[in-house]
From Swiss-Prot:
This is Glycine--tRNA ligase beta subunit. Its EC number is 6.1.1.14. Keywords: Aminoacyl-tRNA synthetase, ATP-binding, Cytoplasm, Ligase, Nucleotide-binding, Protein biosynthesis. It comes from Moorella thermoacetica (strain ATCC 39073 / JCM 9320). One of its GO terms (molecular function) is ATP binding. Pfam families: DALR_1, tRNA_synt_2f.
Length: 694
């Protein structure tokens, strides 16, 4: 027999960003505990609103499954005499296991015969196990910022106010936070607070819906989207898909009702982002667009309640937005009273990081490093004054009133203000785009100024923080250095930038020294740690793109200082693996790698001392392969280089078939090892083949 179970944790309003991770964690923990407690069920599901986390188990068994354990005892020879009589060993083992000696069985184990005791533990009724199991579920949940309340020791996302636990119609008396679970829940805080009795687990959803709570977040999300899109259409426009905002609103309301509002069309004269940011990021409103992609003076929001009095609610939302837009219009007007360039000296008032100076000092470092990168990347010389100016103005909007009020607009407002001041289009684009990509999967800069200054900005931050010892540990990354490093890797890979990460780290480090800032850690330590840090980000990027782990490791073992080259070597080796005959070639190269590594030192190859026909032919093949492969390696065409190297397979096989590498004569041996080392050095420019899995 089986029954459904509902377990609800009622709380004060939990922040929306906590909800999805908590529900996923709750489902995973419950599934694991059900296995450990031997309680099978048909389905594990979790639901949530701002005021509750709910676990629903469909068709949960009424009893634990029987536990059967087979415990190994002494060998049969030691347990029984030749005529089958139990020895003291068998009797003692049976007694210790609590079974009769006649119940011992024989099993084969590691090639021998042993006696085993079979112990059976009857399953307990689920109702006796569930209080412990459900309490364990709650205790396993973790939140970014848990809190305590009253004199209780428990920590949770927000104070727990009630518990409901029903197994069918039977209450499970879970005790937690000074509360005991009952069959009562609470409805919408204002429309039907309750308490409300839930007769059975399966009635839970209906009882809540009757009391203005849609507990199923998936249904709530779908309903919100249908209401929003329908309302936008009736308003003569459309809303764009915004999964993040939709997700947030889903966990801000229990009984959603969408409503429309309007604002003064005069505000449409402001930059689009200035209108949208207060609307979306601060008020959680959806902007409305016309068919031509133009912003309309309308918005749609979601009310936590019924459709009663929507007109009054809409007017209230309009007043709030009008005040924010009026502030934004004022800031926009005031900020443009002085040129953006005139604001740069004020960056001296903003601390970048306590031990790394001010934002003005960072600006000067960016100018220096951006110019260095133009030269390093072999970009056109006419780009130098453009990136220098972009770097000078990139952070200037941090001192504007608009960005102070709306930090999300940094870079965006600088771009608008620079355009107002008559700066070059390339500079305006660079100011806006140097923050791109802001996160994994975000858009990339499409201007060289944005790409170069963005790369310089990230390198400066990474080098400064690593130099100051501010390295991420575990989940702690207060300066978002993982995101910064991912940005460096992504830009290098997507723009196919050819540069030495080690050298660029040195250039960034020198910027601190030149500015009078002595970093706590020496350059060589920063280089070693930061190259490894970026390598990990590259490895993660490659794994996300679906490349095999062994291919990634083989290519990164051959070097990751040139990030783009390491990426493209992985891509091309992955493609080459699919070619016919690759397995045999891999075997040949791996044999060469393994033998060459047995050498205690690097040997000088003397072609004239090659004695056997097979080794002489291998040398000639190596010279021809070098001639074919090296231009392709320099050009970054690693697939073509690999195809050229494939010509070595036959000569390598013949060499190993006919030549004794470890010859008694040390000069002959060392020369043959030198030949293999030369092959390895060529192939190692792409990958360490010995790391590939057949």
């Amino acid at each position: 027999m089986a029954r459904d179970l509902i377990f609800e944790i009622g709380t004060e309003e939990i922040p929306a960003r906590f909800m999805n991770p908590a529900l996923e964690q709750m489902a995973a923990v419950a599934s694991q505990l059900l296995q450990e407690y031997r309680l099978p069920c048909q389905k594990v599901a979790t639901y949530g609103t701002p005021r509750r986390l709910a676990l629903y188990l469909t068709a949960l068994a009424e009893n634990q499954e029987e536990l059967v354990q087979e415990i190994k005892g002494p060998p049969v020879k030691a347990a029984f005499t030749a005529d089958g009589q139990p020895t003291k060993a068998a009797l003692g083992f049976a007694r210790s296991m609590g079974v009769a000696v006649e119940e011992l069985v024989t099993r084969e184990y590691n090639g021998g015969q042993y006696v085993f005791a079979i112990k059976r533990e009857q399953g307990r009724p689920a109702v006796t196990v569930l209080p412990e199991l459900l309490l364990a579920v709650v205790n396993a949940l973790s939140f970014p910022k848990p809190m305590r309340w009253g004199s209780l020791e428990i920590r949770f996302a927000r104070p727990i106010r009630w518990l409901l636990a029903l197994f069918g119609s039977e209450v499970i008396p879970v005790e937690l936070a000074g509360l005991t679970a009952s069959n009562q829940t609470y409805g919408h805080r204002f429309l039907a607070p309750g308490p409300h009795q839930v007769p059975t687990a399966s009635a839970y959803f209906q009882v809540l819906e009757e009391n203005y709570v849609l507990v199923d977040q998936h249904r709530r999300r779908q309903l919100i989207w249908e209401q929003i899109t329908g309302l936008a259409s009736r308003e003569g426009g459309r809303v764009e898909k915004d999964p993040e905002l939709l997700e947030e609103i889903t966990y801000l309301v229990e009984y959603p009702t969408a409503l429309a509002g309007h604002f003064d069309p005069e505000y449409l004269k402001l930059p689009q982002e200035v209108v949208i940011t207060p609307m979306r990021d601060h008020q959680r409103y959806f902007p409305v667009w016309n068919a031509q992609g133009e912003l309309l003076p309308r918005f749609i929001t979601v009310h936590n309640g019924t459709a009663d009095h929507l007109e009054n609610i809409s007017r209230g939302n309009e007043r709030v937005l009008a005040a924010r837009l009026a502030d934004a219009a004022f800031f926009y007007q005031e900020d443009r009273q002085t040129p953006l360039a005139a604001k740069v000296p004020k960056l001296e008032e903003i601390v970048f990081q306590e031990s790394l100076g001010t934002m003005l000092a960072k600006t000067r470092r960016l100018q220096r490093l951006a110019v260095n990168l133009v030269n390093t990347l072999d970009l056109p010389a006419e780009l130098v004054p453009l990136v220098e100016r972009t770097a000078e103005l990139a952070k200037a909007d941090l001192v504007t009133a608009m960005v102070y009020e709306f930090p999300e607009l940094q870079g965006i407002m600088g771009s608008y203000y620079a355009a107002h001041d008559g700066e070059r289009a390339e500079v305006c684009q660079g100011i806006r785009q140097h923050y791109w990509p802001r996160f994994a999967g975000d858009r990339l800069p499409d201007s060289l100024t944005g790409m170069v200054v963005g790369l310089a900005d990230r390198l400066d931050t990474l080098v400064g923080c690593f130099g100051a010892g501010l390295i991420p540990t575990g989940s702690q990354d207060p300066y978002a250095l993982r995101r910064q490093a991912t940005g460096v890797v992504t830009i290098a890979v997507e723009f196919n930038l050819k540069f030495s990460l080690t050298a660029s780290i040195a250039a960034a480090y020198e910027g601190y020294t030149a500015g009078g800032i002595q970093l706590a850690r020496p350059l060589d330590v920063v280089q070693e740690q930061l190259v490894q840090f970026c390598r990990q980000r590259l490895e993660h990027l490659l794994e996300e793109k679906g490349y095999r782990y062994d291919v990634i490791q083989a290519c990164l073992a051959a070097g990751s200082d040139d990030l783009a080259a390491a990426y493209h070597r992985t891509r091309d080796l992955s493609a080459f693996r699919e070619e016919e005959g690759f397995a045999a070639l891999q075997t040949a190269f791996t044999r060469a790698f393994n033998l060459a590594r047995q050498a205690r030192e690097k040997y000088h190859l003397r072609p004239e001392a090659l004695q056997e026909k097979a080794e002489a032919e291998l040398y000639r093949a190596l010279m021809e392969t070098r001639h074919q492969a090296e231009p392709r390696l320099r050009a970054g065409d690693y697939l073509a280089a690999l195809k050229a190297m494939a010509a070595l397979r036959g000569p390598i096989d013949a060499f190993f078939d006919n030549v004794l590498v470890m010859a008694p004569d040390m000069e002959v041996r060392n020369n043959r090892l030198a030949l293999l080392q030369a092959i390895v050095n060529l192939v190692f420019q792409i990958a360490d083949f010995s790391r590939l899995v057949p």
